[in-house]
């Protein structure tokens, strides 16, 4: 629109499930303990989480959806008009703002549903970055 350009890339994956063995009590490698995560209780007769006391020794029984929609790349560029830049004695002037991995919509409780990392040494989220740029031509 006019001198403005917007570019958006949305990444989505549907139909993924993975075991998430870090749920439950147990040894240190299963150190993620989610007290309010749908455990079976007399009031909550869930059939997805057996019990908070279930040790889940082998990492089974905790299959979770890895479906996600991620706002992966957004770029906004403004090209300054010729009359303005000619007064400054330059050939072109462009201002840009871009972002990567701005937000992920998911029910996955790990750090990143795309990587599906399920052990404590790889629970790192995708880095979120924002960059501002200025392009000047003489």
Whereabouts are the PLM-identified features?
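Repeated loop/turn-to-beta-strand initiation elements of outer-membrane beta-barrel proteins
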Residues: 3-6, 83-84
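Hydrophobic, lipid-facing positions within transmembrane beta-strands of outer-membrane proteins
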Residues: 4, 71-76, 128-134
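Flexible loop/turn segments at secondary-structure boundaries
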Residues: 5-7, 14-19, 103-106
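Membrane-embedded beta-strand positions of outer-membrane beta-barrel proteins
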Residues: 8, 95-97, 134
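Transmembrane beta-barrel domains of outer membrane proteins
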Residues: 9, 77-81, 135-137
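Extracytoplasmic gating/loop element in the C-terminal half of outer-membrane beta-barrel translocons
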Residues: 13-94, 99
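C-terminal beta-signal and terminal closure region of outer-membrane beta-barrel proteins
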Residues: 44, 56, 102-138
């Amino acid at each position: 629109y006019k001198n403005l350009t917007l570019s958006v890339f949305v990444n989505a994956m549907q139909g993924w499930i993975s075991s998430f063995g870090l749920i439950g009590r147990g040894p240190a490698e299963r150190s993620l303990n989610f007290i309010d995560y749908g455990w079976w209780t007399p009031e909550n007769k869930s059939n997805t989480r057996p019990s908070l006391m279930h040790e889940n020794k082998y990492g089974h029984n905790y299959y979770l959806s890895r479906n996600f929609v991620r706002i992966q790349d957004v770029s906004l560029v403004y090209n300054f008009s010729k009359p303005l830049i000619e007064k400054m004695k330059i050939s072109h002037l462009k201002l840009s703002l871009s972002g990567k991995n701005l937000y992920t919509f998911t029910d996955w409780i790990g750090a990143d549903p795309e990587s599906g990392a399920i052990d404590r040494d790889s629970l790192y989220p995708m880095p979120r970055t924002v960059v501002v740029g200025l392009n000047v031509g003489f």
